[in-house]
Amino acid sequence: MKIIGCMVVVFALAGCRQVPAHGYVPVSQYDPRRDADKDINDAIAEAHRTGKRVLLETGGEWCKWCHIMDKYFKDHPKLAELRDRNYITVKINFSEENLNEKVLSRYPKIPGYPHIFILDIDGKVLQSQNTGELEEGQGYNLDKFTAFLTGWARRVEAPKS
């Protein structure tokens, strides 16, 4: 009977979604039903906790280049690792279903999609990046994208002796 009880517990736990211990759940999909303001505030709180910067990626499921960027990160795991090591990434939906006008009005005008904003740990805009400048052919330029992510990553000063 103990074996059956243990098996029930194991199977029940196997179905549980793992949530990080600190409670932050990354926003990795464009979703018109999400509360973008809350998502950004949660990311800023996580940035405070981790010392990372916030990378807002605005776009939508309708956006061809948004899908190209997603695939580019999947195809270039070291670039994705660089992003994830230095940034709390939040996808902000912009679509007919939800323009997120109130939230996006706080940021510089967006010339095209996808568009990236880099925020400091207090939510201040450090960079508004037209991703067209990172493109090459039907994809992105690895050197340019790497330089962009590296250049805006937070620098931690070495302790003074």
What are these regions (language model features)?
Residues 1-7:
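Sec-dependent signal peptide recognition
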Residues 110-159:
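Non-catalytic, surface beta->alpha helical segment in thiol-disulfide oxidoreductase systems
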Residues 34, 79-99:
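Thiol-based oxidoreductase modules, predominantly thioredoxin-like and allied folds used
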Residues 98-111:
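Structural alpha/beta surface segment adjacent to cysteine/selenocysteine redox centers
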Residues 14-15:
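C-terminal motif of bacterial Sec signal peptides marking the signal peptidase cleavage site
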Residues 50-64:
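Short active-site neighborhood of thiol/selenol oxidoreductases, capturing the structured segment around
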Residues 35-53:
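A short beta-strand-turn-helix
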Residues 67-82:
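Typically the conserved alpha-helix immediately C-terminal to a functionally engaged Cys/Sec
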